[in-house]
Amino acid sequence: MASYSTNEFRSGLKIMLDGEPCAIIENEFVKPGKGQAFNRVRLRKLVSGKVLEKTFKSGDSVEAADVMDINLTYLYNDGEFWHFMNNENFEQLAADAKVVGDNAKWLVEQAECVLTLWNGQPIAVTPPNFVELEITETDPGLKGDTAGTGGKPATLTTGAVVKVPLFVQIGEVIKVDTRSGDYVSRVK
């Protein structure tokens, strides 16, 4: 099995920790004035989604996680499972609500997603970085009303709620960054 040394740690690297695959979120190399250097690492467990911090001595070796990231097209949700299709061999995979998690609000039919598999089972779904969704509900923007923060909440077709500028109206399609949940622009 492949392994990584602490000097190879980077954000996004997937390693095994206590028999569970984890992804490195942050890696900080610390060299104190006295004593041995070490890496302070923030990890996200891929199965449970929990975030934890761990320190590794400089030069330690850690086993690489045997996970696969594959690009799939999101097809539909049947109420219990979200179905995805591999465009190369047309094989379909289903992921349950625990795997999809909060990313369900960003899944649009025919969107290219990344599915993370461990032992052949899906453990995480990553939606595209940007999605285009229609606004189904928002307050009407009053002309000249910019004394506040300049934003209002808007509900999208998937049920997600995003803060949008005052000039955006119901029925318009907007571009949203799925990593932060922020409004990016209107789609013409």
UniProtKB/Swiss-Prot annotation:
It comes from the Bacteria. GO terms for biological process: peptide biosynthetic process. Gene3D superfamilies: 2.30.30.30, Nucleic acid-binding proteins (2.40.50.140). The keyword Secreted does not apply. The modification N6-(3,6-diaminohexanoyl)-5-hydroxylysine is found at K34. It holds the Pfam family EFP. InterPro entries: Elong-fact-P_C (IPR015365), NA-bd_OB-fold (IPR012340), Rib_uL2_dom2 (IPR014722), Transl_elong_fac_P/YeiP (IPR020599), Transl_elong_KOW-like (IPR013185), Transl_elong_P/YeiP_cen (IPR001059), Transl_elong_P/YeiP_CS (IPR013852), Transl_elongation_fac_P (IPR011768). Keywords: Cytoplasm, Elongation factor, Hydroxylation, Protein biosynthesis. GO terms for cellular component: cytoplasm. NCBIfam families: efp, PRK00529.1. This is Elongation factor P.
